Structure formats: C-alpha cells, structure tokens
C-alpha cells in the first residue's frame, strides 16, 4: 500500500519523512515530485510539481490512519508555502481520500489557525535525483560500502536502506533497532556502527 505526501520545506527533501522510514510497518520510502503537469521534473526544474515523499507500507503491520497521525503530529500544517513546498496528502483511492479528509477535520479542531494542507488525488510520481534518496545514509560512506549498495534503483528500493536511513538520522529508538535487528541481517560491525551513530545523535544538515 502507498502513502504519499509533502511534509516540510527542506533543502534535502529526504529529511521530511525520516520518522516514517523506521516506523513500524514501513517497507520503503522514496522522495520525488508530483502533483504538477511538467513532464520529467528535476529538483532544479520543478515546474508546478510539489516535493513529495512516497511511503510503501505493509497493511498487516500498520495502516493509513497511523501514517496520517504521524503526518499531522510532525509538521506545522498551518504554514503557508509555495506549491513546491506546500503541505499535501496525495490519495490513491476513495478510501484514502475519506480518511485524509477526516483526519484533516480532526486536526483542525485541535488548533485555531487554519490548516493549509491540500488533499489531492495522486498523479505520476517522479523520482528525485539519486543524491536526494536516503540522504542521511549516503552521508556515511563506510556504512554504504559495508552494505555494498550504490545510489540508484537498488538503494531506492532497499528495505534495509529505508530502515537505516531513519535510524541513522536519529528518528528511531535504540530499543526498536535492537528488536528489528534480526530481520535486517546486518553484520556485527554494521550493527555496532549504527548503534554508535544513534547514540551520538549527530544529524547531518544539507
């Protein structure tokens, strides 16, 4: 199942959804552009698209409503932005549309300022350039080399890279990492490296 949204204006679009990268049930994340009419947009030639994060999740382990709750909790939906950076949820079917609208109404009741988030039908999702994908993970060359993974399709589709991108960015707990570790099939050296990175709490800025 897919969950697609725009969360925050960040120079590196990969940062906005790191909390979801290591959230329960999330299989894969990609950053890119959507919602506009310009064919084949790029970061430097975006046209009328919005920077977007696509999240693929396992519906047996989490659900759309849980992801929406995280979305509202972790950004300021009242901030007015240009279309490139606007807050938006892109729905893929009528059920997602209904849930997104209901969650927006619920979120609005808890604050006085008007929410600016747009609920839009999903259109073509264009992947952002490789250097945007799993951005924080790519700032750890030793780890990338140890994982034997290169920027490109393999990195973009990797479950392990998705999870580690969140953990290495400081958006997961050490307890959750330890619980998940058997399913990640990491070497002891890689696991120790991730632990140290999480404990250091150093987040990379663009």
Say what each PLM segment does.
Residues 1-206:
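Flexible coil/turn and secondary-structure edge motifs
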């Amino acid at each position: 199942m897919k969950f697609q949204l725009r969360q925050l204006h960040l120079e590196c679009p990969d940062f906005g959804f790191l909390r979801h990268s290591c959230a329960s049930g999330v299989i894969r994340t990609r950053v890119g552009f959507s919602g506009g009419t310009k064919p084949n947009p790029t970061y430097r030639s975006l046209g009328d698209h919005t920077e977007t994060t696509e999240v693929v999740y396992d519906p047996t382990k989490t659900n759309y409503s849980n992801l929406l709750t995280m979305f509202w909790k972790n950004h300021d939906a009242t901030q007015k932005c240009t279309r490139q950076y606007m807050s938006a949820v892109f729905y893929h079917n009528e059920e997602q549309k209904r849930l997104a609208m209901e969650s927006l109404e619920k979120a609005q009741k808890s604050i006085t300022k008007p929410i600016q988030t747009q609920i839009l039908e999903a259109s073509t999702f264009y992947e952002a350039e490789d250097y945007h994908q799993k951005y924080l993970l790519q700032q750890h060359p030793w780890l990338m080399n140890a994982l034997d993974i290169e920027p490109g399709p393999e990195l973009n589709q990797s479950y392990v890279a998705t999870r580690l991108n969140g953990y290495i960015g400081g958006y997961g707990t050490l307890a959750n990492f330890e619980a998940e570790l058997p399913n990640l099939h990491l070497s002891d050296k890689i696991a120790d490296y991730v632990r140290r990175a999480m404990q250091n709490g150093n987040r990379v800025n663009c």
